[in-house]
Amino acid sequence: MLTSDSLSRRHFMPLAAAAAASSPFVAQGAASQDGYLKGRLYKTLKIGMVKAGKSLEEKFALAKEAGFDGIELNTPGINVEEVNAAIKATGLPVDGSVNSSHWQVRHTDPDPAVRAKALESLKEALRQTHAVGGNTVLLVVGKGSDGPEEEIWKRSIENISKAIPLAAELGVPIAVENVWNQFCYDHEGDHNQTADKFVKYIDEFNSPWVGMQFDIGNHWKYGSMGDWIRQLNKRIIKLDLKGFSREMGKFTKIGEGDLDWADVRKALAEIKYAGWA
């Protein structure tokens, strides 16, 4: 999934189309040496990126015209009837959603009452996503500042696991995103870190209904994204994209910065990834 700064109506169409067509990751002519990725990636973006358009239908239409194949919403909180009407009118599907409360109401919170609210939010996100035809709910599991890693690891897995039966019933996987939340990596560490902890964390759920929505730009500061992709392998069920510059120490537009996109494409071909990005 492409991420970017806010776009006005005047700028949305040309910039979004350019991003969709010429990104070093999704560009049709820059797939991989053997061409494996060509035709296997579906471009999507978050609804919050589409600043132009007053109605949901207008936003969907703009995204489709810009060349995107799908769109992600924020759940819970959507009007299911309105979303389905926008899908029908534009032909643009909802490929998934982002659990809208996961930063504030966390599965790592030491308060059981807060974790119960986080669980209900996740369950409702799964229901609403299913109701509009989406196939994933992106989830940030919490924050490392909520306690020692061993404790938040255990409590988050226990809490999220309670939603797995519903995810399986609806056919909507829970997609854990790697973010700067001081969990499963060393936030003050160097750029030689691996995805070992993320692999272990996902595997402890022991369920095909929990995987990774891997953000390629988020952890370039901390390790080789190609190698992380190789480690995570089939645990990756969806991708998010952004650029990052180690030299400048900040996020960048896709194609800028120093992220090794060539190795990323090679790694994705090696694991035979196909799906949303």
Region locations from a protein language model:
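N-terminal pre-domain/capping segments
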Residues: 2-131, 135, 150, 161, ...
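Conserved beta-strand edge residues that scaffold enzyme active sites
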Residues: 77-78, 100-101, 143-144, 180-182
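Mobile beta-alpha loop/short-helix "lid" or hinge segments that flank ligand
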Residues: 132-144
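Generic structural signal for helix capping and beta-alpha/helix-loop junctions
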Residues: 80, 104, 146, 183-184, ...
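Substrate-binding cleft of secreted/luminal carbohydrate-active enzymes
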Residues: 275-276
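Acidic/histidine-rich catalytic cores of soluble enzymes
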Residues: 64, 161-258, 262-265, 270
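Short, hinge-like loop/turn segments at secondary-structure boundaries
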Residues: 88-91, 111-115, 155-156, 193-195, ...
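Surface-exposed cleft-lining segments at the edges of enzyme active sites
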Residues: 142-152, 181-190
